[in-house]
């Protein structure tokens, strides 16, 4: 049955085609508990920087039905199969079809480190290269004690914490690039990328906390995310100027961010961090965060002669 699968590019401006594409991802979220497409992938597909692919099968009973969805381009590949159609070989067939037109090295995420993704990766020449820990906090508190700690942390060593202001864009992007110089996604954000996120329905300037030194320079930030109707809040991105280390700024920002999420009515907080960032892992563990899930990034490297590389 898997050989009846077809790959095509849906028109996301068409309501029916867009619904079919995103319905596959929604079905996976309902079963797996996490989104198969991260935020950057969704922004890229809506902006046209990457291409959506829908995998459909044809049957006499249902005619053409979307059973898989992928987002490809810019050296990245994301693929998900509707849980109702897993275990039938569709994932392998879809991946072969996507790889047939791919050029150069590819990276792919397995959100939640799904066992089936490990098998597909192994069979198609992908090797694990990164692990992101998804951590979850204990119950958040807006109590006087917690608020007092965070407020005290807002004013130490000449550093103050306040919301993002209009005009901070260029300085923030420059600092973000330095903080995440070796980070494949976060470090390459542009002012346009920043503004695209600020245009999202969940954005509030008061959730974007900026640490400034006594001269008004940005030395760190904690951008928290409180999506409408969500119980969990998120430490969306937290960073401290590499030239401003060891002064407790990161901890102060994190406490202020957790306080802000509690003010927004969120009962817990989540965060994604690199598994090999031992100092960040230690800080979050000290503040009661525990591991919830793991995301694994795979890479498929192609040598100059077109053969797979295993190093």
Per-range role (PLM):
Residues 87-101, 237-240, 246-263, 281-286:
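Conserved acetyl-CoA-binding loop-helix of GNAT-fold acetyltransferases
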Residues 62-68, 216-220, 279:
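Glycine-rich acetyl-CoA-binding "A-motif" of GNAT/NAT acetyltransferases
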Residues 81, 238-240, 273:
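Hydrophobic adenine-recognition pocket in adenosine-nucleotide-binding enzymes
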Residues 1-43, 149-187, 309-311:
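Short amphipathic alpha-helix that is part of the acyltransferase structural core
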Residues 124-146, 255-311:
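Active-site/acyl-donor-binding loops of N-acyltransferases
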Residues 1, 73-78, 83-158, 296-300:
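Acyl-donor-binding surface of acyltransferase catalytic domains
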Residues 36-53, 70-75, 185-240:
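A conserved beta-strand-loop-helix scaffold within acyl/acetyltransferase catalytic domains
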């Amino acid at each position: 049955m898997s050989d009846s699968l077809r790959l095509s590019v849906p028109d996301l401006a068409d309501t029916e085609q867009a619904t079919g594409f995103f319905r596959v991802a929604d079905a996976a979220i309902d079963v797996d508990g996490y989104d198969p497409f991260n935020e950057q992938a969704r922004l890229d597909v809506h902006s046209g920087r990457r291409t959506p692919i829908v995998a459909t099968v044809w049957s006499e009973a249902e005619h053409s039905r979307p059973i898989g969805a992928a987002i490809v381009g810019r050296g990245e590949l994301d693929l998900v199969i509707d849980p109702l159609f897993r275990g039938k070989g569709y994932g392998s067939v879809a991946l072969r079809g996507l790889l047939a037109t791919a050029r150069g090295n590819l990276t792919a995420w397995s959100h939640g480190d799904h066992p089936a993704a490990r098998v597909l990766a192994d069979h198609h020449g992908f090797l694990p290269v990164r692990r992101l820990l998804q951590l979850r906090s204990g119950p958040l508190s807006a109590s006087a004690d917690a608020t007092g700690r965070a407020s005290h942390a807002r004013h130490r060593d000449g550093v103050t914490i306040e919301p993002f202001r209009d005009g901070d864009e260029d300085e923030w992007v420059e600092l973000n690039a330095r903080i995440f110089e070796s980070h494949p996604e976060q470090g390459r954000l542009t002012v346009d990328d920043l503004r695209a996120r600020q245009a999202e329905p969940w954005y509030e300037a008061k959730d974007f906390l900026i640490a400034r030194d006594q001269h008004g320079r940005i030395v760190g930030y904690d951008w928290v995310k409180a999506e409408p109707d969500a119980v969990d809040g998120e430490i969306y991105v937290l960073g401290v100027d590499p030239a401003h280390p060891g002064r407790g700024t990161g901890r102060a920002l994190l406490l202020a961010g957790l306080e802000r999420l509690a003010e927004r009515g969120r009962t817990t907080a989540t965060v994604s961090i690199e598994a090999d960032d031992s100092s960040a892992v230690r800080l979050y563990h000290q503040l009661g965060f525990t591991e919830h899930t793991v995301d694994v990034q795979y890479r498929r490297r192609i040598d100059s002669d077109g053969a797979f590389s295993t190093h």
